[in-house]
Structures are given as structure tokens and as C-alpha cells.
């Protein structure tokens, strides 16, 4: 693709380290949108980031703890640019987190971290996220957006962040128009990408699930 002047840009809810592990280090040569669009890079150079505040991060962490105390089987992943932090270390939770976070660290108390570079907090629910933990967390943090990124995952993040916003920043940087952009998506967290492209392909069965 590159030889034909086409820039391939993976846009994912996964962390940058995980995308490198899955797609190879060659992704650093072009545009990349990790963490649901909370930051973007071209050629390994960061173009933008949309972190949450420390106060917001603490509220989300406390909300997840409260869901757990009420019987919800949930766990939080505090995602920064390069490392994801967790409190839960049981095998069941770790096996889910390791799929998407290649660079991670377990800590005793997430609120003891600096929390000055939190892009998002991903919440894994062993039940159905949108039915169980999602609505409870949404009530506690109305100033943040909660995005369903899978049957079991909810991403809590800045209200301005999205894959669509990240793509628009990359397009402006590269001088690429929506007419020159094709988008391929498979879940609800891909929807805003379609606003930035005139060519798109969606897997509707998955988008509606």
C-alpha cells in the first residue's frame, strides 16, 4: 500500500504497545490511532492527546470499586500513553486485559498513581457491560463519555476524544481529504470515523450487536 502512496492507519481501542505487538513495529512509520482516538501519532511523533483530569480519573476508579462492592464482577484498566495500570491480578481478569494491553503494571492502589496522563479508563465486566456496570458508571461521571467498545468493555474518557477527531487531525497533518479516505469498522466505537470518510465498509452485524 505504501508503495502506491496509500497510508494505512490502524484505529483501535487497543494501546499503542499492543498494536505494535500485533501489527509489528512498522506501524510507527505511518499514522496510528490507539486508545479509541485519545491520542494520535504519525511517524512515531505525537500529534495530539485528550487526557482526563486526575479528579475525573479518581471518580471513575471509585465508581468501578463501588460496582464491585455491589457484586459486579468488574475491573478497571487505567490507560496512559505507554503503560496500563490495574489493581485486579486474578487470572480471569488478567487474561482479558493481556489481549489488549501488552504493556501493563499491577499496583496496590490505582488512586496512589500520579494520574496526570490518563487517556482513558477501560472497565471490563464479566457480565454485559451496557446492561450491568455501564449505566452505573455513567451516572457517576456525567462529565466524561462512556463508550461501549465490546460486549464486556466500556471505555471512559474525555468528552472531546474519539477516533473521528483523531482521524481529522491526521488528515489535516497529511493533507488528506475525506474524499481520499476509506474507513473499515466493526463496532460502535468506530462510528465517528465514518464522518471523516466518503468511502466506508462496516460489518453491520457486529455494529448492531
Question: What residue ranges belong to the model's regions?
Answer:
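Short active-site oxyanion
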Residues: 4-9, 28-30, 120, 179-181, ...
Amino acid at each position: 500500500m505504501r508503495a502506491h502512496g496509500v497510508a494505512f492507519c490502524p484505529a483501535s481501542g487497543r494501546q499503542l504497545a499492543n498494536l505494535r505487538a500485533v501489527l509489528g513495529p512498522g506501524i510507527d512509520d505511518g499514522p496510528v490511532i490507539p486508545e479509541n482516538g485519545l491520542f494520535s501519532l504519525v511517524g512515531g511523533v505525537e500529534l495530539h492527546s485528550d487526557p482526563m483530569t486526575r479528579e475525573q480519573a479518581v471518580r471513575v476508579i471509585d465508581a468501578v470499586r463501588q460496582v464491585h462492592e455491589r457484586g459486579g464482577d468488574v475491573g478497571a484498566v487505567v490507560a496512559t500513553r505507554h503503560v496500563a495500570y490495574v489493581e485486579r491480578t486474578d487470572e480471569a481478569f488478567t487474561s482479558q486485559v493481556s489481549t489488549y494491553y501488552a504493556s501493563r503494571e499491577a499496583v496496590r492502589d490505582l488512586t496512589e498513581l500520579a494520574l496526570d496522563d490518563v487517556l482513558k479508563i477501560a472497565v471490563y465486566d464479566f457480565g454485559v457491560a451496557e446492561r450491568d456496570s455501564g449505566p452505573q458508571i455513567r451516572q457517576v461521571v456525567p462529565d466524561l463519555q462512556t463508550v461501549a467498545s465490546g460486549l464486556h468493555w466500556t471505555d471512559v474518557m474525555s468528552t472531546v476524544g474519539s477516533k473521528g477527531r483523531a482521524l481529522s487531525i491526521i488528515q489535516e497533518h497529511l493533507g488528506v481529504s475525506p474524499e481520499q479516505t476509506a474507513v473499515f469498522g466493526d463496532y460502535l466505537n468506530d462510528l465517528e470515523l465514518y464522518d471523516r470518510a466518503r468511502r466506508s465498509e462496516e460489518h453491520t452485524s457486529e455494529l448492531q450487536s
